[in-house]
A protein has these predicted regions:
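Catalytic beta-strand/loop signature of glycosyltransferases that borders the donor
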Residues: 139, 213-220
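Acidic donor-binding loop at a coil-to-helix junction in glycosyltransferase catalytic cores
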Residues: 195-204
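Glycine-rich, basic loop-to-helix element that forms the pyrophosphate-binding segment
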Residues: 84-101, 122
Length: 288
């Protein structure tokens, strides 16, 4: 697939982006009503997309396929459905999907979240006024059942300097509402296998390669977190993955040995703690 750069030259020779792609992955356990809401939140954007890539990560079910078929009727060629033969996980699905994205700017979207109507317009404005930015996210509002009832807000650091410093300890971008330059993501090897941390690993490689980020200090997305999210961030496998990520940072010179040890102790302690304690840490410490 050839990449179609939907942009024009503005004043002073600065590139102005107009079009953007949307990249979403869905698998068989997703609820059809959530997928419908997620897609419709993109359909109602104040700045419309001309390229929506929906990756089906393995065979789905009749209910999900019905939602997709209805949306294909509504959206026509704008909705490009990519079906993978088997479920390979989020990172693999996004790697396949990004190949089909026709625009330089790609907006990530999860299949159970709800974007604010002006989310993409605000992000496009950042790229048009800050040519140095290659990745942009913003505030997400987590909810359990009603998007108007906010459980908590995830507020990422704003400037690139703050992002780099924050990344030494925690994920500096909210992946569900990230928009990035396709060329920058592909230049560092795109998403790679890293259990539950594929996005964090990608951001680190981008930052280390000199690509800059920015986080809009306004809500861009309603994120369906659920009250049991802390349960998915547990166990030896997750603890070892986190330790491997911080080892990568240390070995790359991104952090020192003291920060490596501190991060491993804190993160492993959280992953291996009893559920009640991890829930407290997740809600009161790690999400703040």
């Amino acid at each position: 697939w050839a990449v179609i750069f939907d942009m024009r030259r503005g004043t002073m020779g600065v590139v102005e982006y107009r079009g953007y792609s949307v990249l979403m992955s869905v698998y068989h356990k997703e609820k059809p009503e959530y997928l419908k809401q997620a897609i419709e939140s993109i359909q109602t954007q104040t700045l419309s997309t001309n390229d929506f890539v929906l990756v089906c990560d393995g065979p789905l079910n009749e209910s999900l396929d019905s939602v997709i078929a209805a949306k294909q009727q509504e959206m026509g060629k704008t909705l490009n459905v990519v079906r993978l033969a088997k479920n390979g996980g989020l990172g693999n699905a996004l790697n396949e999907g990004i190949k089909y994205c026709k625009n330089e700017l790609v907006a990530r979207m999860d299949s159970d979240d709800i974007a604010y109507p002006d989310r993409c317009e605000k992000q496009i404005a950042v790229f048009n006024t800050h040519s140095e930015v290659s990745i942009c996210s913003g505030i997400v509002e987590e909810f359990t059942t009603d998007p108007n009832t906010v459980d908590t807000k995830r507020v990422p650091p704003e400037t690139n300097a703050e992002i780099v410093e924050f990344a030494k300890k925690r994920n500096p971008f909210n992946h569900p509402c990230v928009m990035y330059k396709k060329s920058a993501v592909e230049a560092v090897g795109s998403y790679q296998d890293f259990y539950l941390l594929e996005d964090y690993y990608l951001w680190l490689r981008m930052l280390m390669a000199g690509y800059q980020g920015y986080n809009i200090q306004e809500p861009l997305l309603h994120m369906r977190a659920g009250s049991d999210m802390y349960l998915r961030r547990a166990g030896w496998k997750y603890a070892k993955t986190q330790a491997r990520l911080f080892k990568f940072m240390r070995d790359s010179g991104f952090i020192g040995n003291s920060q490596y040890i501190k991060s491993c102790v804190i993160r492993s302690g959280s992953a291996l703690a009893p559920n009640w304690l991890r829930k407290f840490m997740f809600e009161k410490v790690l999400r703040k």
